[in-house]
C-alpha cells in the first residue's frame, strides 16, 4: 500500500514562496482526489480498549453541577433538573466503540449548507475550496490529520452522540427497557450495551443502510459481554418513527431516549421515509414528524417512565443575520398537553464552543461567545404520570 500524500514543512514553505495560490489549490485538489478519503484510523485493538473503558465509566464521572448555557436564551422551559443546573462534561472515552463501525457511513452524509467528506472528495470544485484552508488556517505542512481538520472546519462532518453520555443516562435513570426512535450512528446503542442497568434496547431508524451496521455492532457487543455481566438484547426497526406500529410495546419501556434529526440540517439519504424529504418547512416538520413521532412513542412508555430528547433550535441565514427557528418550545408545548405528562427539567450536554455537526451556530449572547461559561445542548426530560 502506497504511503498517504504528505507535504513536509520545508516543502510547503517553498511552495508558498514560488507558486501561485490558486494554481496550488487546484493542483492539490487533483492530486488528493487520486488518494482515498482520509478516514480516521481505528484498529480492532483500539475498539476493544475503548469499549472496555466505556463500560467502566460511571455517571458521577461526567455529571457536573454547575451553570451552563445554550445558544438560545429565551426558552420557555426551565434549564434545571432537580432545582439546579447539571450537565454531562465533554469526554471522548468510548467514541471508538461506535465510530469503528460507523465512521465511513457517517462521513458519507452532507449537510444542507456544506458537503460532507465523501461528496467533497468526489468534486474538483469542493476539493479546490477545501485546499484554501491550508492558507487561511496557516498550516505549515499537510498530512492525513491536517486534512481531517480542514474537512471538519471548512466542510461538514456529522458528529457522534457521545456513547458515554448515553451510558450515563441509562445508568442514572436505572433504565432497563429502552426505546430509541432515531438511532443515528449507533452511539446510544453502544452506550446501552456498556450500561449497567440496560436489559433490552429497541431502536428505530429509516435509513436502510444503517441497519446492516447496527447488526455488526450488536454482534460485537454481545460477543464481548463479560462473565459477570447480565445479558442484553436489542432489536432494530427500519421505519419512520411517525409511521411505525408499536402496539406490541404498549406501556413497555421505562426510558425513551433519542436525538432526532434537526429538521433538514443533515440529509442522511434521499429515501422517502426521511423526515427532511417529507417535510419542506419547519412548521410541517415539527407538527407532522416530530410531534407525531412523540405521540406514537409516548404510548410505549410505562407510568413513571422518562422521555429524554436531545434537540436544539436551529438557525437560518437571512439578510446577513442568523434567524432562530424554534423546535424545542413547540415540542415541549406539545408534550405538555398530554394528560399524563410532567416536565421534569433539562440536563445539559457539553459541546465544543464551535460545534461543526448539524450546522448549528455557537451559543452566543448578542453575537459574542461566552468564553468563560460551558456551552451545552439541552436534553429535555419528561415523566409519564399515572394519569390520575
Name the predicted role of every residue range.
Residues 321-388:
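Class I S-adenosyl-L-methionine
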Residues 209-214:
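Short alpha-helix immediately C-terminal to the canonical SAM-binding loop
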Residues 166-172, 178-191, 203-205, 239-241, ...:
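Conserved proline-anchored active-site loop of SAM-dependent methyltransferases
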Residues 1-159, 321-329, 344:
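N-terminal accessory regions of S-adenosyl-L-methionine
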Residues 194-200:
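Conserved S-adenosyl-L-methionine
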Residues 215-248:
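S-adenosyl-L-methionine
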Residues 305:
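Glycine-centered, small-residue-biased loops immediately flanking beta-strands
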Residues 253-296, 314-322:
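Mobile active-site "lid"/loop adjacent to the S-adenosyl-L-methionine
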